[in-house]
Amino acid sequence: MIEKIWSGESPLWRLLLPLSWLYGLVSGAIRLCYKLKLKRAWRAPVPVVVVGNLTAGGNGKTPVVVWLVEQLQQRGIRVGVVSRGYGGKAESYPLLLSADTTTAQAGDEPVLIYQRTDAPVAVSPVRSDAVKAILAQHPDVQIIVTDDGLQHYRLARDVEIVVIDGVRRFGNGWWLPAGPMRERAGRLKSVDAVIVNGGVPRSGEIPMHLLPGQAVNLRIGTRCDVAQLEHVVAMAGIGHPPRFFATLKMCGVQPEKCVPLADHQSLNHADVSALVSAGQTLVMTEKDAVKCRAFAEENWWYLPVDAQLSGDEPAKLLTQLTSLASGN
């Protein structure tokens, strides 16, 4: 229902306009206060790169963060990552992730990023505290990447990158809750890079596609082409589950059942195992896998995806960030 409201297909969005105007007024006032220096943002002693979006829901930010961290690491840059830690609840903040940190403590995305990149990752509702925690334990970190947080103006940033869903883009264009917008589309004029996940990019936007890898067994880590799996039940607890189901079909998989779950939904063995019957195979997103690995069964697999950015702009962006991190 919410997708129909935000896309404009349902007329119910008009009933929510008063709340949207209030949201826009408050969020605009907050940004203006920081712009006029009526409120002061905390500036880290190292460069900060924000990877965020203008809309609620999944746009592909986390794969971009992983891509960015890995690309900078390949260039010899030591990167730290901070996040709000949505969906997690730690005993205290900031929380610096370790191999024992669970998604219940830190949230799905931070654990995924930590496992994929081995970079220092910290979470806190106050992102500046997360940055301080990383730099205290890892003083060699040269640059901070923040997963989400475009609207978290308490943390000063040197580079802003916005990720857009190229198919849904901005829906009906209204602020939350009548539409999907956290900020209006005009905000794109002030950011450093706009990355478009799928769809048809517009002038100045960097095209990106999510490339699926081989399916990975949660229990033993073996890999195979996902098309080789039979009697598949697909599960996705991400911001936009239909994207994952479409990816499976693109890979030649016709799921017997597709199960969309809420983003950041907590999972347990009983609920997940109930999704599949004898002889069926469960295929989930990598984001779901970080929550299920501890209690996985032999017929549970996940499909990792990697961001692939096209054109000349990604190389220019990486050169800019490498120069910033190196102090040049």
UniProtKB/Swiss-Prot annotation:
Protein family membership: Belongs to the LpxK family.
Name of this protein: Tetraacyldisaccharide 4'-kinase
Catalytic activity: a lipid A disaccharide + ATP = a lipid IVA + ADP + H(+)
Residues reported to bind ATP: T55, A56, G57, G58, N59, G60, K61, T62
Keywords tagged on the record: ATP-binding, Kinase, Lipid A biosynthesis, Lipid biosynthesis, Lipid metabolism, Nucleotide-binding, Transferase
Pathway recorded for this protein: Glycolipid biosynthesis; lipid IV(A) biosynthesis; lipid IV(A) from (3R)-3-hydroxytetradecanoyl-[acyl-carrier-protein] and UDP-N-acetyl-alpha-D-glucosamine: step 6/6
Organism the protein comes from: Shigella flexneri serotype 5b (strain 8401)
Pfam families assigned: LpxK
GO terms for cellular component: plasma membrane
